[in-house]
Curated annotation (Swiss-Prot):
Record keywords: Cell inner membrane, Cell membrane, Membrane, Mercuric resistance, Plasmid, Transmembrane, Transmembrane helix, Transport, Transposable element
Localization per Swiss-Prot or TrEMBL: Cell inner membrane
UniProt organism field: Pseudomonas aeruginosa
Pfam short name (any one): MerE
InterPro entries reported for this sequence: MerE
Gene Ontology MF: a single term: mercury ion transmembrane transporter activity
Coiled coil: none
Protein's name in the database: Broad mercury transporter MerE
Amino acid sequence: MNNPERLPSETHKPITGYLWGGLAVLTCPCHLPILAVVLAGTTAGAFLGEHWVIAALGLTGLFLLSLSRALRAFRERE
């Protein structure tokens, strides 16, 4: 019924842009304390507790990458 081939190209929503945006929200460095609380008692939580500088740098890099990819995906839509 709503086959994507039948829809006009301007109505296609860039799903990759939304996925990259969601990853940017999850890996934002300001969410590091929330991640530490949520992951408490797990191996990932122990890693965050012991190596918080490495985790913050890694999350910041991933955040910048995913944010730039999300902005590029939404900019290509226009």
